[in-house]
Amino acid sequence: QAKIGKGSKFGYGGISVVVHHDSVIGENCSIGQLVTIGGGNSKYPGVPTIGNNVRISCGSIVFGGITIGNNVVIGAHTVVNFPLPDNAVVVGNPGRIVRIKESKC
């Protein structure tokens, strides 16, 4: 069963959101509609572990045994199949990191 942290929300009631049953989603995440969080690829077998305060925008796909850091923003219709560090902003298909946000103290 997927583990979903406290305060995490699914846009539009989770319309067309697919979450692999072994995935882990941290606290205070925001998952848009039409998002897939799925299993395996040959380079990163397994399922995603998503950190806290992550925004996954509509139509995005996150898959494989990867770790998405805290405070990450994944833009709309982005495909992510590689690990992301904390505070990354990633967009595109294939996804690419366009910025690392400064952490606030």
Give residue ranges: language-model regions.
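Short beta-strand-to-coil "C-cap" segments at the C-terminal boundary of structured domains/repeats
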Residues: 99-103
